[in-house]
Amino acid sequence: MNQGKIWTVVNPAVGLPLLLGSVAITALLVHLAVLTHTTWFPAFTQGGLKKAA
């Protein structure tokens, strides 16, 4: 492991949940930004434009 000595400074019982939690929060924030700041993504998730019959 390249950065293996980090666990001598930070306890893994604290560091791993912080790392995984920060990754999850970042992913949720990116998805929220895509949903709220684009027009194509909500249309894509709703199936696009409906064609007249």
Curated annotation (Swiss-Prot):
Compartments, record wording: Cell inner membrane
Topological domain spans for side Periplasmic: 36-53
Organism classification: Bacteria, Pseudomonadati, Pseudomonadota, Alphaproteobacteria, Hyphomicrobiales
SUPFAM superfamilies, per the entry: Light-harvesting complex subunits
GO CC, any one term: plasma membrane light-harvesting complex
Annotated InterPro entries: Antenna_a/b (IPR000066), Antenna_alpha (IPR018332), Antenna_alpha_CS (IPR002361), Light-harvesting_complex (IPR035889)
Protein residues bound to a bacteriochlorophyll: H31
GO MF annotations in UniProt: bacteriochlorophyll binding; electron transporter, transferring electrons within the cyclic electron transport pathway of photosynthesis activity; metal ion binding
Gene3D superfamilies associated with the record: Light-harvesting complex
Oligomeric form and interacting partners: The core complex is formed by different alpha and beta chains, binding bacteriochlorophyll molecules, and arranged most probably in tetrameric structures disposed around the reaction center. The non-pigmented gamma chains may constitute additional components.
Main subcellular location of this protein, as a coarse class: membrane
Family that this chain belongs to: Belongs to the antenna complex alpha subunit family.
Keywords: Antenna complex, Bacteriochlorophyll, Cell inner membrane, Cell membrane, Chlorophyll, Chromophore, Light-harvesting polypeptide, Magnesium, Membrane, Metal-binding, Transmembrane, Transmembrane helix
Listed transmembrane segments: 15-35
Cytoplasmic topological segments: 1-14
GO BP field: photosynthesis, light reaction
Membrane topology, as annotated: Single-pass type II membrane protein
Pfam annotation, one family: LHC
Described function: Antenna complexes are light-harvesting systems, which transfer the excitation energy to the reaction centers.
Identification of the protein by name: Light-harvesting protein B-800/820 alpha chain
